[in-house]
């Protein structure tokens, strides 16, 4: 479960970071 949660969070954070860099 933890791995799944970390993966999900990591994806979310990565998207946010990309969005920030994109702007």
Curated annotation (Swiss-Prot):
Cellular component aspect of the GO annotation: extracellular region; membrane; other organism cell membrane
UniProt protein name: Lycosin-II
Leucine amide: residues carrying this PTM: 21
Purpose of the protein: Has strong antibacterial activity and biofilm inhibition effects against Gram-positive and -negative bacteria including E.coli, S.epidermidis, and A.baumannii and oxacillin-resistant S.aureus and meropenem-resistant P.aeruginosa. Is not cytotoxic against human foreskin fibroblast Hs27 or hemolytic against mammalian red blood cells. Its mechanism of action involves binding to lipoteichoic acid and lipopolysaccharide of Gram-positive and Gram-negative bacterial membranes, respectively, to destroy the bacterial membrane.
Annotated disulfide bonds: none
Subcellular location: Secreted; Target cell membrane
Keyword annotations: Amidation, Antibiotic, Antimicrobial, Membrane, Secreted, Target cell membrane, Target membrane
Tissues with expression: Expressed by the venom gland.
Family: Belongs to the cationic peptide 04 (cupiennin) family. 05 subfamily.
GO biological process, one term: defense response to bacterium
Organism superkingdom: Eukaryota
Record keyword Transmembrane present: no
């Amino acid at each position: 479960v933890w791995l799944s949660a970390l993966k999900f969070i990591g994806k979310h954070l990565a998207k946010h970071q990309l969005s920030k860099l994109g702007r």
